[in-house]
Amino acid sequence: MSQQVIIFDTTLRDGEQALQASLSAKEKLQIALALERMGVDVMEVGFPVSSPGDFESVQTIARTIKNSRVCALARCVEKDIDVAAQALKVADAFRIHTFIATSPMHIATKLRSTLDEVIERAVYMVKRARNYTDDVEFSCEDAGRTPVDDLARVVEAAINAGARTINIPDTVGYTMPFEFAGIISGLYERVPNIDKAIISVHTHDDLGIAVGNSLAAVHAGARQVEGAMNGIGERAGNCALEEVIMAIKVRKDIMNVHTNINHHEIWRTSQTVSQICNMPIPANKAIVGSGAFAHSSGIHQDGVLKNRENYEIMTPESIGLNQIQLNLTSRSGRAAVKHRMEEMGYKDTDYNMDHLYDAFLKLADKKGQVFDYDLEALAFINKQQEEPEHFRLDYFSVQSGSSDIATASVKLACGEEIKAEAANGNGPVDAIYQAINRITGYDVELVKYDLNAKGQGKDALGQVDIVVNHHGRRFHGVGLATDIVESSAKAMVHVLNNIWRAAEVEKELQRKAQNKENNKETV
């Protein structure tokens, strides 16, 4: 009987580090729910000590997720571990993941310490984490460049201290697959208590072999793989979990292991991460790219028509990618829209039916026919904007001709007040943004503007993703409409609402801090 490989997802921690703007707590929760639906065993959802916002999002996810183990990262520092436990304690069960560097380079130049001191610190911090939970994971940062004898000493000590999972990261993506497999085999040969822990691997894609390294490690005995959906992450990214999962499934003949992932949810989860993180998936991306199951060669097309297995080692259906079909029109009622969402596997709690149906009717009136991908875009891109809005786009118009100069008029609801402004700009989008900024008075610098089509043909929805800089912080916004200028305006309004909410959160934190200080003085 094959053994299980635990899937540890770090999209919301290591993956998020690649984004130009941090995700909101609600966006993180949306991704966490998608990962839970896909069946990941463990999800690492943040680094609570890093900021109040990260603490809040970890706490929210820990309170909500029931079918996956929620994990938070902590350095081998007392405060890190204590704060992680504080954020996670609302969960029925949780994991603390603590780490320290073990390579000679990191020990000498970063930690300015010795291997013996590193081992002593690791043991102390694993024991401290065990005071909060019996599920403690310990990582040897830069294990790929750590001599295996040194690594074995650290691993043995961490297991004796109570770590149930030992993670071996190729932190800088330096190791070759045969080398990495050798490290795992070497640990099994050298560590006498290794049977008391699960060996995990965490690989990076700097040389394009993160997935290869993870699979080689599994073949050598690792039983947990860490990675991120779509391979997002620092520098060149993390190990792409969807690739590892499907490689294990397709090549079960030689891997002789399995995962508990619902692989029919892979495509939808990948799309959710792509849309929320504003990271388009390359067409030639393995497993989830738009061209992953496309056949253009005449010879290949002929072979596939005769027998799909001639050129397909897996099917689109195996990852949940079914043939896109016509579903709904403006004459469809709420029940029909709800039924189609149920057919696609969504529950009532996954989206707001009132918002979805209103948006559906507007879109159906414009384009006549609404497809599955339209519904998902309306449900889950617009969902990010369902929180109470201080700013709302009431009206806009743009005049432009053959010259570069355009004029925009905008009405914006600011709380209970409607304000209007007009402005010129270098094109219609710039004019809209100038007018909006005049109304709000916010000093924002546009640092990224992306336009992507959601759907097919001339009636496709246009999704605009923007990132702005505001007083040293970056904020992300998204807008969706059949008109690009309208999408752009909605994206900017979304950004401004995110800035406004961040300011309100800061005010609330200051108020709580002041109340705490006042209570101290009273005592």
From Swiss-Prot:
Which GO cellular component terms are attached? cytosol
What residue stretches are annotated with the Pyruvate carboxyltransferase domain?
Answer: 5-267
Which intervals of the chain are annotated as region Regulatory domain?
392-523
Q: Where does Mn(2+) bind?
A: 14, 202, 204, 238
Q: What is its EC number?
A: 2.3.3.13
Q: Which residues form the propeptide?
A: 1-2
Question: What does the record say about activity regulation?
Answer: Inhibited by EDTA, mercuric salts and by leucine. Inhibition by leucine is non-competitive with respect to 3-methyl-2-oxobutanoate and competitive with respect to acetyl-CoA, and is more sensitive at pH 6.5 than pH 8.5.
Cofactor(s) required, per the database record: Mn(2+)
List the SUPFAM superfamilies hit by this protein, alphabetically: 2-isopropylmalate synthase LeuA, allosteric (dimerisation) domain, Aldolase
Name of the top EC class for this enzyme: transferase
Q: How does activity depend on pH?
A: Optimum pH is 8.5.
Xref: SMART domains = LeuA_dimer
- Its domain of life reads Bacteria
Biological-process GO terms, alphabetical: L-leucine biosynthetic process
Q: Which InterPro entries match?
A: 2-IPM_HCS-like, 2-isopropylmalate_synth_dimer, AIPM/Hcit_synth_CS, Aldolase_TIM, LeuA/HCS_post-cat, LeuA_allosteric_dom_sf, LeuA_bact_synth, PYR_CT
Q: Which UniProt key words apply to this protein?
A: Amino-acid biosynthesis, Branched-chain amino acid biosynthesis, Cytoplasm, Leucine biosynthesis, Manganese, Metal-binding, Transferase
Where does the protein end up? Cytoplasm
Q: Which GO terms describe its molecular function?
A: 2-isopropylmalate synthase activity; acetyl-CoA C-acetyltransferase activity; manganese ion binding
Q: Name the reaction it catalyses.
A: 3-methyl-2-oxobutanoate + acetyl-CoA + H2O = (2S)-2-isopropylmalate + CoA + H(+)
CDD domains assigned: DRE_TIM_IPMS
> Which NCBIfam families does the annotation name?
leuA_bact, PRK00915.1-1, PRK00915.1-3
Q: Which PANTHER family match?
A: 2-ISOPROPYLMALATE SYNTHASE 1, CHLOROPLASTIC-RELATED (PTHR10277:SF9), HOMOCITRATE SYNTHASE-RELATED (PTHR10277)
Q: Oligomeric state and partners?
A: Present in a monomer-homotetramer equilibrium.
Instruction: State the similarity comment.
Output: Belongs to the alpha-IPM synthase/homocitrate synthase family. LeuA type 1 subfamily.
Please explain the role this protein plays, according to its UniProt record.
Answer: Catalyzes the condensation of the acetyl group of acetyl-CoA with 3-methyl-2-oxobutanoate (2-ketoisovalerate) to form 3-carboxy-3-hydroxy-4-methylpentanoate (2-isopropylmalate).
Q: Tell me what this protein is called.
A: 2-isopropylmalate synthase
Species this protein is from: Salmonella typhimurium (strain LT2 / SGSC1412 / ATCC 700720)
Lineage of origin: Bacteria, Pseudomonadati, Pseudomonadota, Gammaproteobacteria, Enterobacterales
